[in-house]
Amino acid sequence: NWPMIINAKQFGLKGEHKWADTRAMQKALNYAKKNKGTTIYVPQGEYHIRKPLVIYEATTLLLDDKAILKRCGKDTLLKNGRRFKSYYGYNGNSHIHIAGGTFDMNGYDYPYNNTTMCMGHACDVQIVDVTFKDVVGGHCLDACGVNGLYINQCKFLGFNDPDGTRFFSEAVQLDIQVSGAFPKFGATDGTITKNVIIENCYFGNSETPGMQPWNRAIGSHASRYHKYYDNIHIRYNVFENMKQYALTPLKNKNTYIHHNVFKNCEGGIRFLAVKDGKNAKDMKGNERGTQAGNNLNIFQNQFIGEMRKEAIRIQSYNNIKHENIVIAKNEFDHESQSVYLKDIKHLYISNEADIRFKKVNID
């Protein structure tokens, strides 16, 4: 039973034709839905997509290096579920592999807030060698309730926030299925993203007029009581000119951030607990109080250039402490860089004397 490879051209792909291209791509994806394990090859060319493409179980989307899927509409480019279908836990469309090419949100011509790829309620999502471009307001990837996310050799280029209201937007959002977090589809059942590797990627600007580098590269801004982003590895990436903290994990467990380069970013890594409010609610809606993270390892990163915010900021609240924090063998090269550490139990720091440290409430 050999895996089947089909060429999207067989389904009527024309190039620079939003009606034909969208229809052909979805027909190919529907064929793969019926024939699990299919690889869809998208040849060199620019293909215009007017409404969201839906990718189903066990589908590989393989784009030529010179293939571009260009958004010509207001919505997302690719999602792994349908709007009114129910998906629970990690049991939605899974084993989705995407490789090569460019997913261009075309934010200059279509300045509408949305996210390039929406992956929810899934396991085993792999994205390799893809360029994401020119997002307005949203994310390159919203991984919401994904168990097993692998991102390698990708580029995340160009972001715009015309209203100034999306300062918290990350290129890659690690997310939890709660109300308001993931409007595309699926049950808001608290399914959280875990088991993640993001490596060998570049985050920066595109050459498109009006675009900027990302505010944040990778992070989370939603949580719930007793829910933790877990087993997250961010390594061998370059973050250039990020407009805020490049990495913003929220109440993670077992996080490894190493061998990254932070170049001329506003700030480096911010690791927060959840203090109160909706992120401290349980799944029944009752507010339960502060929770902190555990086992954060930040080592062998390079921080280059002026930073107006801290190179590393780790903070909790209400005397609830993060536990088991390691900061070792990082390089800091500018006198503006600093480290702020508050509310930590079991902190290990290697001899990084060449940087300003502020420590509050550490045991």
In which residue ranges do the predicted regions lie?
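Right-handed parallel beta-helix
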Residues: 29-33, 103, 107-125, 207-210, ...
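Extracellular beta-strand-rich solenoid/capping regions of secreted or surface-exposed proteins
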Residues: 26-31, 47-62, 68-99, 105-124, ...
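Parallel beta-helix/beta-solenoid
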Residues: 56-59, 64, 93, 98, ...
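Short glycine/acidic-rich loop motifs that flank beta-strands on beta-rich extracellular proteins
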Residues: 37-38, 49-52, 65, 70-76, ...
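Acidic Gly/Asp/Thr-rich repetitive segments characteristic of extracellular carbohydrate-active
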Residues: 8-43
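Intrinsically disordered, low-complexity Ser/Thr- and acidic-rich flexible linkers and loops
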Residues: 87-90, 164-166, 178-191, 219, ...
